[in-house]
Amino acid sequence: MGGNLYMEILKVEGVSKQIKNHRILDNISFSIFENEIVGLIGPNGAGKSTIMKCITGLYHMSEGKITICEYDLKSDSSNALKNIGVSIEYPSLYPELSGHEHFKIMANWKHLDSKRIEEMEQFSDLKDGLYRATEHYSMGMKQRLVLALAMMSKPKLLIIDEPTNGLDPQAIFDLRNKLLTIRNEGTSILLSSHQLSELDKLADRALFIKSGKLIKEKNMDELRQNHSIYRLEVSNPKNVLLLLKNSFIKEHILYMQCDSKEEFSKSLQILIQNDVLVYSLAEVHQDLETYYKELYKG
């Protein structure tokens, strides 16, 4: 994703943020393109929320430039901010008001018609909860409401901060599907998380932030492929350990780690040539968190 084939929705150039003598962000630069989901990854205090607040205009950057749909945030903030939707904090909800009342307030503020209210109420999937006060909502319901409100004006870019916090597995699954729907309908997404595995099968790219600096950028497909792990049931596991340097045994089960499809094919050929019978082989869910821990250790 990206390159010259896609429109640049967001461009962050050399952005720094300093409060007194503390440099919270240090020369951050990246771009987000049309129909792309990008994850901002890092531990608590890395600077994820700060860069998001700079992009949404909640914080003023000390240095750098931010462009949203070709509008300069500093010199033309009104037009720049019209192109983004923000889903950052639940406190933006009024606890005594219902979901339906929130949609009406947002529609009035954005000058939207009743048809758009109906569309986004349906998208929120709140059902009977639409007419209950939000103080009685579950975390999942609050997240769906905040997300739908952020999408009311069909923004080109959605900013969403740690969306899975406090959600149960079903709510996370539902949220992931909604984010993919949003992307497929033409909105790019920048979301933050401190868990790399949350981006699996969702994001196109991951931006890794540590101590206010962008330390690495990775394509998610490449990241998964380069760390593929396979579980094998074979006739002679100990012999495989001698044949393949990329194999290991964990809890009495044989695994093989491959950095490419070519290495995977070569490894299988070695087993066949040495008369090792492979009874079963399965790709294990990518251990992205191990990669994350290795990147941030020390």
Identify the meaning behind each predicted range.
Residues G99, M220, H285-L288:
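Structural motif detector for alpha-helix initiation sites
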Residues M61, L73, S77, M220, ...:
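Residues at or immediately preceding the N-termini of alpha-helices
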Residues I229-G298:
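Short, charged/small-residue-rich alpha-helical element at the C-terminal edge
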Residues M1-S16, G298:
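ABC-family P-loop ATPase nucleotide-binding domain
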Residues L5, K82, Q122, N184, ...:
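Alpha-helix boundary recognition
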Residues R176-C258:
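ABC transporter nucleotide-binding domain
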Residues L10, K17-L191, L196-S197, K201-D204:
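ABC transporter nucleotide-binding domains
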Residues D76, L223, Y291, L295:
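Residues that scaffold the ATP/ADP-binding catalytic core of kinase and kinase-like folds
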